[in-house]
Amino acid sequence: MFRTMLNSKIHRATVTQADLHYVGSVTIDADLMAAADLLPGEQVTIVDINNGARLETYAISGPAGSGIIGINGAAARLVHPGDLVIIISYGIMDDAEARRHVPKVLFVDAENRIVGQGGDPAAALPGDPSSLRGDVLDPAGARGLGGGA
């Protein structure tokens, strides 16, 4: 059996530009692509934290060190400059490899510079009081997102 597993994610990247009339894709700073183990043309999922939009496209490399996260083509109707996004890649692997696999998890600042990295897909950025681990419940609804009983 093969499993589709998280290969990498760039967490809370800031969209720097959007171009509706570009042919398509997402332009990602080459340094971020390398750190996230992304290849040009690789399929990625983009999740917009601001509005909940979720879409699939492919990655293209932008200038290294530029911090660019550019939404191209029709996706520019869903994701806008200034939006926070999670860029996710998946890998297909056999069961044994999936059980050993450690994803690359990147945390970036407002300029899309790497400020933390690891291999725990549920991890929150250390020292960031505005985020919770993905495997922690918020039963009191303290985040204001409708949590609680």
Curated annotation (Swiss-Prot):
The keyword Lyase applies. Its EC number is 4.1.1.11. One of its GO terms (biological process) is pantothenate biosynthetic process. Residues 119-149 are annotated as: Disordered. Substrate binds at residues 57, 73-75. InterPro entries: Asp_de-COase-like_dom_sf (IPR009010), Asp_decarbox (IPR003190). Is synthesized initially as an inactive proenzyme, which is activated by self-cleavage at a specific serine bond to produce a beta-subunit with a hydroxyl group at its C-terminus and an alpha-subunit with a pyruvoyl group at its N-terminus. Pathway: Cofactor biosynthesis; (R)-pantothenate biosynthesis; beta-alanine from L-aspartate: step 1/1. Signal peptide: none annotated. It is found in: Cytoplasm. The active site is at residues 25, 58. Keywords: Autocatalytic cleavage, Cytoplasm, Decarboxylase, Lyase, Pantothenate biosynthesis, Pyruvate, Schiff base, Zymogen. It catalyses: L-aspartate + H(+) = beta-alanine + CO2. It is an enzyme of class 4 (lyase). It comes from the Bacteria. Pfam families: Asp_decarbox (PF02261). Its cofactor is pyruvate. The modification Pyruvic acid (Ser) is found at residue 25. One of its GO terms (cellular component) is cytosol. PANTHER family: ASPARTATE 1-DECARBOXYLASE. Catalyzes the pyruvoyl-dependent decarboxylation of aspartate to produce beta-alanine. Belongs to the PanD family. Heterooctamer of four alpha and four beta subunits. This is Aspartate 1-decarboxylase.
